[in-house]
């Protein structure tokens, strides 16, 4: 494909032209004209390429060529034409008679482009140059427009370009809520009330280290008419005259005497007034064991046995403490089996309740349990 070569490359002479070749080319063109540059070398008898013959004739052998250096007037005209026409050297050479396009191009690249900033414009010549440019521009044919390739247009060319400014969204920082002093104070008071109520419900255990039972003044539920730690619940069972009534507000003196105050509402029964808190008070307070056993013989009630504080009975006797007698395990078992011997069981004050046992007592108890 492509353009056909101007001549056959076989046997073509290359290099500088000789004077004989210049003379043959000049004589042939003067007699026959330029004609076709492809057939000219063959017709003239030259072993040269047609392009080489054309360039040799146009640039060197023509009779109308202007020899010598380019004048300042020509330089100014070249500058003006170049500013309007650009690098169209053939059009610029058409406005300069006797100058070729190749000569003007070489002179521009080697001289004018370097000293363009030092070039001085003369008013007399500028008027002539402007007139020449206007006449030549009107007579010159319009330049051919570049052909545009047919095809689909891109989406970027079809869509209108709209520049949108992006607005930054500012995050709203919520300030931390101020603490409400009233609410905090109310919550604190509520917690204090709850804690005090819990402590009131738990209560204090009886003091087993010599203090009198009258010192325990805290009630279980904090209500009037309900059994408290001061109440001697065992006295409810020790009343021989009327065992069916209940006695509240019963206190025990320091010498073991019982002072009972009859309650008018005491005949209601154990199921109505007895609760778990009163049972704990019964087990914690240590009444007279002898009086309790006497009442047990008089009143055979099945519910009485569950209120006996057997820990107090085990730990203390009438005169001698069973845990400190250092007897054999058989004697301890015999004492436990002889429950009718009331003489061996005396009044107890629970002074040693909760105290750790001696090493001998612990070993004796373990031996009895393992036997």
Curated annotation (Swiss-Prot):
Q: Cite the record's tissue specificity text.
A: Expressed in stems and flower buds. Expressed in seedlings, roots, cotyledons and apical meristems.
The protein's GO terms of the molecular function aspect are: DNA-binding transcription factor activity; transcription cis-regulatory region binding
Application of this enzyme or protein: Promotes flavonoid biosynthesis when expressed in tobacco (Nicotiana tabacum) and tomato (Solanum lycopersicum) through up-regulation of the biosynthetic genes. Tobacco plants exhibit increased insect (Spodoptera litura and Helicoverpa armigera) resistance due to enhanced accumulation of rutin.
Describe the inactivation phenotype. Answer: Reduced flavonols levels in roots. The double mutant myb12 myb111 and triple mutant myb11 myb12 myb111 accumulate less flavonols in roots, leaves, stems, inflorescence, and siliques. The double mutant myb11 myb12 is specifically altered in flavonols content of siliques and roots. The triple mutant myb11 myb12 myb111 is impaired in flavonols biosynthesis and exhibits a reduced UV-B tolerance.
Induction of synthesis: By nitrogen deficiency, sucrose and UV LIGHT. Triggered by HY5 in response to light and UV-B.
**Main localisation, per the record?**
nucleus
Where is the region Disordered? 136-183
Origin superkingdom: Eukaryota
Where along the sequence lies the DNA-binding region? 37-61, 89-112
Q: Which GO terms describe its biological process?
A: flavonoid biosynthetic process; flavonol biosynthetic process; positive regulation of DNA-templated transcription; positive regulation of flavonol biosynthetic process; response to auxin; response to ethylene; response to light stimulus; response to salt stress
Q: Which Pfam families match?
A: Myb_DNA-binding
Q: Which Gene3D superfamilies match?
A: Homeodomain-like
Q: What are its GO cellular component terms?
A: nucleus
Composition bias of kind Basic residues appears in: 146-172
Tell me the InterPro entries matching this sequence. Homeodomain-like_sf (IPR009057), Myb_dom (IPR017930), Myb_TF_plants (IPR015495), SANT/Myb (IPR001005)
Q: Where is the HTH myb-type domain?
A: 9-61, 62-116
Task: Report the locations given in the UniProt record.
Answer: Nucleus
Q: Which keywords accompany this UniProt record?
A: Activator, DNA-binding, Flavonoid biosynthesis, Nucleus, Repeat, Transcription, Transcription regulation
Q: What does this protein do?
A: Flavonol-specific transcription activator involved in the regulation of several genes of flavonoid biosynthesis. Activates the expression of CHS, CHI, F3H and FLS1. Controls flavonol biosynthesis mainly in the root. Confers tolerance to UV-B.
| UniProt-recorded name of the protein | Transcription factor MYB12
């Amino acid at each position: 494909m492509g353009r056909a070569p101007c001549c056959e490359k076989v046997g073509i002479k290359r290099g500088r032209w000789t004077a004989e070749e210049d003379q043959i080319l000049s004589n042939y063109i003067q007699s026959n004209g330029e004609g076709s540059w492809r057939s000219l070398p063959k017709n003239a008898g030259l072993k040269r390429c047609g392009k080489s013959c054309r360039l040799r004739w146009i640039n060197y052998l023509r009779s109308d060529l202007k020899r010598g250096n380019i004048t300042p007037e020509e330089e100014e005209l070249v500058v003006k034409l170049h500013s309007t026409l650009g690098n169209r050297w053939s059009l610029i050479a058409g406005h300069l008679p006797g100058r070729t396009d190749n000569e003007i191009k070489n002179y521009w690249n080697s001289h004018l482009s370097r000293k363009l900033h030092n070039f001085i414009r003369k008013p007399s010549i500028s008027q002539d140059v402007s007139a020449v440019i206007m006449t030549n521009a009107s007579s010159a044919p319009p330049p051919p427009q570049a052909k545009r390739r047919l095809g689909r247009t891109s989406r970027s060319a079809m869509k209108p370009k709209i520049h949108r400014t992006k607005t930054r969204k500012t995050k709203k920082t919520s300030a931390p809520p101020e603490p409400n002093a009233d609410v905090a104070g109310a919550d604190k008071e509520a917690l204090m009330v709850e804690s005090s109520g819990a402590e009131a419900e738990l209560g204090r255990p009886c003091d087993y280290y010599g203090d009198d039972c009258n010192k325990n003044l805290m009630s279980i539920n904090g209500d009037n008419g309900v059994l408290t730690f001061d109440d001697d619940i065992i006295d409810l069972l020790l009343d021989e005259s009327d065992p069916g009534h209940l006695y509240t507000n019963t206190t025990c003196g320091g010498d073991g005497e019982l002072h009972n105050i009859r309650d008018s509402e005491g005949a209601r029964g154990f199921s109505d007034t007895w609760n778990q808190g009163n049972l704990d008070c019964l087990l914690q307070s240590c009444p007279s064991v002898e009086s309790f056993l006497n009442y047990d013989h008089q009143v055979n009630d099945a519910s009485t046995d569950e209120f006996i504080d057997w820990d107090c009975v085990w730990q203390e006797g009438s005169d001698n403490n069973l845990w400190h007698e250092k007897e054999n395990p058989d004697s301890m078992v015999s004492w436990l089996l002889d429950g009718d011997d009331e003489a061996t069981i005396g009044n107890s004050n629970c002074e040693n309740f909760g105290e750790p046992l001696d090493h001998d007592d612990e070993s004796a108890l373990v031996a009895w349990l393992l036997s």
